[in-house]
Amino acid sequence: MKIWYVASEAAPFMKTGGLADVVGSLPQAVAGLGEEVSVVMPKYGSIAEAYVDEMEYLFDLIVPVGWRKQFGAVLKLERDGITYYFIDNEYYFKRDGVLYGHFDDAERFAFFSRAVLEMIGKMEDVPDVLHCHDWQTGILPAFLRIHYQHIEAYQRIRTVYTIHNLQYQGIFPEEILGELLQFGPEHFTAEGIQHNGLVNYMKAGIVHSDQITTVSPSYRDEIMEPYYGEGLDGALRYRAVDVRGILNGIDLATNDPNTDQRIAETYNLDTYKEGKVVNKRALQERLGLEVRDDVMLIGFVSRLVDQKGLDLINGVREELGQLPCQFAFLGSGQPEYEGIVHEMTAAHPGKVGSYIGFDIELAHLIYAGSDAFLMPSRFEPCGLSQLISMRYGTLPIVRETGGLRDTVKPYNEFTQEGTGFGFMNYNAHEMLATIEKAIRVFYEKENWHALVHQAMTADYSWKQSAKQYRELYHLFA
């Protein structure tokens, strides 16, 4: 079966978040099961030159963009048994700064989605499945169904649409309906791609794809309800029989403390006690923390946005500063949350360290050098950081929501089982109590090391998830 993964980013070529990690890892896992796999993404101007040098030009495209025709080109790169296709258009994709948030994002990703479909018309091997990801490719299943179903070559193609984060929906003015998408008014309805009087690319994917997935079973259930549904819970409930939750994995080769060259000292299950101490000291020195082996160090690596629980941290930040532990923050995002981290760092020198921005080496050092890892998310579709931290022997402290609930087993003091610590309600003092519990267990060394052992030996690979995706694809066979 030929499966194309269509996404706006994929590691290692371009990454702004977890989407790129998934599209970088899942195709390899599915290919390992014997499927013929390709990935299609834009050719951004900021892709590293080393990768660009490996790309092979295939052919040009003329892509309908409303009443206009836009030029594009398709390039190809083979890597680790996967064929990567890159859609090139310098006007849309050779821009400085961030990938998203441009004034013409509706047009940029409409162009990309139609370019993928136009590209298929020039290929000898037509894909059986187009697996689209998040709002940036949500319009593709709608294009396929509305503009291409009359063409025989496209009639057997089926679509899978994965929701990585329902909060980001790709919402645009009604005017693009005809001018850009070339859809008639019959599609601008509550049953179609309209939501609150606007065109919604995420909803287009939900309405027009053949199957829908989310990135964890619990998140799948949560988004059926208004609290988590971001206004689209009704559309999701209507398609509920076609929606399934399949848990993300992580790339075990990239995230391996035994081979990770980004950390101060590598370690494994037998040597983690010594290895983590070396990394802890390096992390403390890097962030200006007091260098102490005996104090618990709690890491935090995340986008600093409302989803990630920064308001809980802010609500008890004075109490956190008085705890017998240290904090290491890494991330960037909304100015008000960056300010909270700055203020905590200034108020508690030697106890709170931070870096505003993103540094992949520092991120890995936090995973390796911390004792615990804080993720108090308001919602979390899956989360990858908790999986990485457990693989590195760093126990997560999480709010039990979405993928965090599915992946972190809270500590049971009676059975000594668990891989981390959890709290249920989105409440600052409940989070604080859970951190205090983790600190107590940290000093019960036998119990703590038993938890670390369980965390490091759990399976965080794509193996089981890839099998579930393969079963989903073969529903169409």
Swiss-Prot record:
Belongs to the glycosyltransferase 1 family. Bacterial/plant glycogen synthase subfamily. This is Glycogen synthase. ADP-alpha-D-glucose binds at residue 15. Synthesizes alpha-1,4-glucan chains using ADP-glucose. GO terms for molecular function: alpha-1,4-glucan glucosyltransferase (ADP-glucose donor) activity; alpha-1,4-glucan glucosyltransferase (UDP-glucose donor) activity. It comes from the Bacteria. The keyword Transferase applies. CDD domains: GT5_Glycogen_synthase_DULL1-like. It catalyses: [(1->4)-alpha-D-glucosyl](n) + ADP-alpha-D-glucose = [(1->4)-alpha-D-glucosyl](n+1) + ADP + H(+). It holds the Pfam family Glyco_transf_5. It comes from Exiguobacterium sp. (strain ATCC BAA-1283 / AT1b). Keywords: Glycogen biosynthesis, Glycosyltransferase, Transferase. Pathway: Glycan biosynthesis; glycogen biosynthesis. HAMAP family: Glycogen_synth. One of its GO terms (biological process) is glycogen biosynthetic process. Its EC number is 2.4.1.21.
